[in-house]
């Protein structure tokens, strides 16, 4: 999920759509599912427009950025649907930016509730340049090696969902916040500096400008076709254990949405069996429905990549409560205030 500047993309009705296709639905989304031609979003938006006559207007930004935009528009909402990632979806719920809505697929989706639902499974990952490094860094300690000075970069916690995930993963891998922050303080000696975008780091790794960066599994798998020098890895802790934070795409209905009914229709459409079955084929993601198991090669590759890696997730509500304080502490320990 790279963090790009907000960009407005209008996905217009197909030529074959009915003449009554004047209604719209506006989506504020973290990116990653609209990358490249024939993406999952593009295919589903086109199919939705054809089926309903409703045009999809798409606004893209970082996980925290799209929520901040919703907050600024609280008195005059412009969006109908929000797609972001934890802990930003929990922040949106806590700030009462989301409306109550139980989706048609709720019973088939673990962790769905009356305010938001997982949309696509995803996981924190790391990438390295396999042309310049014979093997991936085996452990977190390896990343402190001097050879990575100014050759390592991760996106900024608080701005990018993936960057926030790096901070949380450090807490988990080192056993506590204190130990995680201590490590990130040391790692800063090798870090190139802040990056508002996770996705742009992939090209830098591919070109060898940096050797290592953070990312997420869905995005990195999709990008590897265009970036042949990039490979995925997960560093091990001092016990030799590799783990990956689960950071799903999550969808919710915006409180006070101008086209609330259209928003509900789109959410149900994206969570349908038909749409979920194609998310790996088109965008390398994994479906969230318990009754959908794709058989395409992308799905097989994604599941194979996670072999030997333990997935985990924190109590996201607790993370959302302490996020501002944790981000402030991150800036302090990395001297990036």
Curated annotation (Swiss-Prot):
Entry's Gene Ontology cellular component terms: outer membrane-bounded periplasmic space
Primary site of residence: periplasm
Localization in the cell: Periplasm
A Gene Ontology molecular function term of the record: thiamine binding
Keyword terms of this UniProt record: Periplasm, Signal, Transport
InterPro entries: AminoethylPonate_ABC-bd, SBP
Top-level taxon of origin: Bacteria
Signal sequence interval, chain numbering: 1-21
GO biological process: thiamine transport
Keyword Protein transport: no
Family: Belongs to the bacterial solute-binding protein 1 family.
Function: Probably part of the PhnSTUV complex (TC 3.A.1.11.5) involved in 2-aminoethylphosphonate import.
Official protein name in the record: Putative 2-aminoethylphosphonate-binding periplasmic protein
Gene it is expressed from: phnS
